């Protein structure tokens, strides 16, 4: 099976970017509560 590098990178970015964005929002709200 041939691995599509660009597809792999696009999938990784598609997963990592929203996750990190939600993580940053969570940290901001958590720090505001303290």
From Swiss-Prot:
State the InterPro entries in the record: PSII_PsbM, PSII_PsbM_sf
Q: Which domain of life is it from?
A: Eukaryota
Q: What residue intervals traverse the membrane?
A: 5-25
Q: Where does this protein chiefly localize?
A: plastid
**What's an example GO cellular component term for this entry?**
chloroplast thylakoid membrane
Keyword field contains Plastid: yes
GO biological process terms on file:
photosynthesis, light reaction
Topology class, membrane: Single-pass membrane protein
Q: Where in the cell is it found?
A: Plastid, Chloroplast thylakoid membrane
Keywords carried by this UniProt record: Chloroplast, Membrane, Photosynthesis, Photosystem II, Plastid, Reaction center, Thylakoid, Transmembrane, Transmembrane helix
Q: What does this protein do?
A: One of the components of the core complex of photosystem II (PSII). PSII is a light-driven water:plastoquinone oxidoreductase that uses light energy to abstract electrons from H(2)O, generating O(2) and a proton gradient subsequently used for ATP formation. It consists of a core antenna complex that captures photons, and an electron transfer chain that converts photonic excitation into a charge separation. This subunit is found at the monomer-monomer interface.
- Which family does the UniProt entry place this protein in? Belongs to the PsbM family.
The annotated subunit structure for this chain is:
PSII is composed of 1 copy each of membrane proteins PsbA, PsbB, PsbC, PsbD, PsbE, PsbF, PsbH, PsbI, PsbJ, PsbK, PsbL, PsbM, PsbT, PsbX, PsbY, PsbZ, Psb30/Ycf12, at least 3 peripheral proteins of the oxygen-evolving complex and a large number of cofactors. It forms dimeric complexes.
UniProt-listed NCBIfam families: PS_II_psbM
Q: Which PANTHER family match?
A: PHOTOSYSTEM II REACTION CENTER PROTEIN M
HAMAP family per UniProt: PSII_PsbM
> What is the name of the protein in this document?
Photosystem II reaction center protein M
The gene is: psbM
């Amino acid at each position: 099976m041939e691995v599509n590098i660009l597809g792999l990178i696009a999938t990784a970015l598609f997963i990592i970017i929203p996750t990190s964005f939600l993580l940053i929002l969570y940290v901001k709200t958590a720090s505001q509560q303290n």
